Amino acid sequence: MPKLQSEPNTRELGQLLRHWRKTRNRSQMEVSLDAGVSQRHFSFIEIGRSVPSRETLIGIANALEVPFRDRNTLLLAAGYAPMYADTGWDEQEMGRKWPRA
């Protein structure tokens, strides 16, 4: 089991998850079913009473279709190290000429 990198900020994590759930117009039940966790456990995570495992958090992020660039924020709030590289367009890609349609 991965160790926590820092003290979890359960309030921030819950607020972030609630934001993504509302943005996606999903109920707690829908998200919990898609993530493979009980609705009660998801509710406890969202209100800050429980800290999910890294795997559970990734499953919830998948269920909510959280963009990869925003998943690191969720991981950090839960006390885990980020796992997604923050890569942008590099100069070579920006200078590439794309074929016209």
Where are the predicted features?
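Alpha-helical residues within the helix-turn-helix
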Residues: 22, 33, 62
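Short amphipathic recognition helices of helix-turn-helix/homeodomain-type DNA-binding modules
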Residues: 2-3, 55-58, 62-101
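A short, Lys/Arg-rich alpha-helix, primarily the initiator
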Residues: 1-24
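Residues in the helix-turn-helix
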Residues: 30, 41, 51, 70-73
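Residue-level signal for the short linker/turn that defines the boundary of a DNA-recognition helix
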Residues: 15, 25-26, 52-55
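Recognition helix of helix-turn-helix/homeodomain-like DNA-binding domains
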Residues: 35-52, 59-61
